[in-house]
């Protein structure tokens, strides 16, 4: 998937992932499941949306250290399953114009089938009530959580690629699903530093540049097609 999306960015707050230093290092086992080796790593929490039984879209923040990753895993039934970074970008493309991209595509082994949702290829309008579904890193049970929110006007990003929400998102919600009427219409990626009660998300229209050709849904249950994603980066 060699697609590019160019977005205009302002200064954002710390991305919606959390880090923790743990004495484990994940490596890929023959089964695709994760084994552990003794090593200090930094664990980065985020959320991803499965749009195909083998593919997940998340943010470049979650996979931003892809060149240095010890491993990146998807939590399936409370078990870590090793994934491969198919595409990842969290970088400024043009400093003068502040053009920026923050998207990642992950792939799991073909022997593993994810619950995938359809991501609607449409713009999102100001005033729409929506639901956020993701994984808070403080939730030790690895269960998805949902919050109601509303799309609000904001001049930070140009529509229709980017929209704003009337709430600040918790850690672990980078890559959370935005839905309305039970359909995924976007994905969160960051909080604003200009407004403490504003966060941002990509519309389904923006995500379609990465997901449309491979979007093959298997479920309509958004809680089932969102997964916690964990990146492991060597601490030293």
Stretch-by-stretch model annotation:
Residues 4-13:
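Sec-dependent N-terminal signal peptides
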Residues 34-59, 175, 197-198:
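A conserved glycine-rich beta-strand in the N-terminal activation segment of trypsin-fold
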Residues 43-45, 51-98, 190:
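Catalytic-histidine neighborhood of serine endopeptidases
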Residues 48, 54, 58, 106, ...:
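Terminal peptide-recognition signature
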Residues 71-72, 82-89, 114-115, 185-236:
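C-terminal cap/linker of serine protease catalytic domains
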Residues 95, 114-174, 188-198:
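Flexible, gly/ser-rich surface segments that form the specificity/activation loops bordering the active-site cleft
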Residues 16-18:
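Boundary at the C-terminal end of the N-terminal hydrophobic targeting segment
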Residues 44-46, 52, 70, 99-104, ...:
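Envelope-exposed proteins and targeting segments
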């Amino acid at each position: 998937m060699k697609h590019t999306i160019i977005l205009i960015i302002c200064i954002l707050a710390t991305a919606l992932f959390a880090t923790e230093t743990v004495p484990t290092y994940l490596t890929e086992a023959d089964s695709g499941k994760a084994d552990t080796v003794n090593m200090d790593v930094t664990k980065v929490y985020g959320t991803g949306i499965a749009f195909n039984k083998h593919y997940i879209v998340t943010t470049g923040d979650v996979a931003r250290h892809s060149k240095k990753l010890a491993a990146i895993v998807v939590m399936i039934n409370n078990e870590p399953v090793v994934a491969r970074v198919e595409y990842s970008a969290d970088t400024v493309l043009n400093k003068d114009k502040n053009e920026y991209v923050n998207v990642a595509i992950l792939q799991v082994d073909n022997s593993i089938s994810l619950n995938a949702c359809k991501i609607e290829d449409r713009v999102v309008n100001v005033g729409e009530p929506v639901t956020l579904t993701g994984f808070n890193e403080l939730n030790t049970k690895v269960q998805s959580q949902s919050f109601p929110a509303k799309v609000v006007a904001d001049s930070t990003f140009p529509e229709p690629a980017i929209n704003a929400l009337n709430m600040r998102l918790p850690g672990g919600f980078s890559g959370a699903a935005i839905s309305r009427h039970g359909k995924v219409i976007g994905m969160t990626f960051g909080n604003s530093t200009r407004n403490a009660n504003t966060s941002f998300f990509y519309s389904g229209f923006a995500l379609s540049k990465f997901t449309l050709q491979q979007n093959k849904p298997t479920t309509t249950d958004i809680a089932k097609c969102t997964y916690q994603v964990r990146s492991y980066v060597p601490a030293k």
